[in-house]
Each structure stands twice: as C-alpha cells, then as structure tokens.
C-alpha cells in the first residue's frame, strides 16, 4: 500500500490592524475575487486606490506561503478574500460654540486565500 501525503490545497495570508477603512478595501477586493493570481496582481498594480498596495503585498505573501509549503509554484487563484472591521479610533473635531463632533478612524483586517481551484 502506498500512502498519499495530504498536500495543502490552500495558502493563507492575513493583515491585521490596517489603517485603511473596510469600505475602501472592499471596493478593490471585489475586483480580484475569483481571478488568477497573475491577473489579480496586474489589476492591483495599475489601480490608483490606496488599498491596492496593501492587497498586492498580501497576495505576494500568500503566494510565497504556498510555494514554501509545497516547494513548487502552481497556477493559483484568489479563492476567497474577506475584509473585517478592525479597531475604530475616535477623534474629536472642534465645532461652533465650543462643541465638538466625533470623527471615526476605522481600521480593517484582511485575509486572502489562494488555491488551485476557485470555490
């Protein structure tokens, strides 16, 4: 009998406590979900949004994690990407008559999963 190794079919990379708001990151995430890694990296490279650089580095990191686990680099797809809300910092802005209004500085957590097949 020959034993088959359980090869991991997925590789993960996550970013916690990002300073970009979840709304801005989700706008870019919807463009790359379900695409091949090469196609997703090309989209992110030429996208003018601030979240593009963060997602670009995150996908490259997940690709390196996959290559490190298996020792080879296959044609991978972005099978799932999700953005969760991180910590919200509350700041005040001076207003008229000595009052102030609240400003919310939102953060996000991003997780990328690469696999050989799209779910």
Curated annotation (Swiss-Prot):
UniProt KW keywords: Ribonucleoprotein, Ribosomal protein, RNA-binding, rRNA-binding
- Annotated GO CC locations: cytosolic large ribosomal subunit
The protein's matches in InterPro entries, at most eight in alphabetical order, are given as: Ribosomal_uL22, Ribosomal_uL22_bac/chlpt-type, Ribosomal_uL22_bac/org-type, Ribosomal_uL22_CS, Ribosomal_uL22_sf
GO BP, one example? translation
> Where are the annotated coiled coils located?
none
Q: What protein family is recorded? A: Belongs to the universal ribosomal protein uL22 family.
Query: What GO MF terms are annotated?
Result: rRNA binding; structural constituent of ribosome
Give the protein's recorded name: Large ribosomal subunit protein uL22
What does it do? This protein binds specifically to 23S rRNA; its binding is stimulated by other ribosomal proteins, e.g. L4, L17, and L20. It is important during the early stages of 50S assembly. It makes multiple contacts with different domains of the 23S rRNA in the assembled 50S subunit and ribosome. The globular domain of the protein is located near the polypeptide exit tunnel on the outside of the subunit, while an extended beta-hairpin is found that lines the wall of the exit tunnel in the center of the 70S ribosome.
Keyword RNA-binding in annotation: yes
Name the Pfam families for this protein: Ribosomal_L22
Q: Which PROSITE patterns match?
A: RIBOSOMAL_L22
What is annotated about its quaternary structure and interactions?
Part of the 50S ribosomal subunit.
């Amino acid at each position: 009998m020959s034993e088959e190794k359980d090869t991991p079919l997925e590789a993960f990379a996550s970013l916690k406590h990002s300073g970009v708001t979840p709304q801005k990151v989700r706008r870019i995430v919807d463009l790359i979900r379900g695409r091949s890694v090469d196609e997703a990296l090309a989209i992110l490279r030429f996208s003018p949004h601030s979240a593009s650089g963060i997602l670009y580095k995150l996908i490259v990191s997940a690709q390196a994690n996959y290559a490190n686990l298996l020792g080879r680099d296959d044609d991978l797809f972005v099978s799932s990407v999700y953005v969760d809300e991180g910590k919200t910092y509350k700041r005040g802005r001076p207003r008229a008559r000595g009052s102030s209004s609240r400003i919310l500085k939102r953060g996000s957590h991003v997780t990328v999963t690469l696999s050989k097949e799209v779910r």
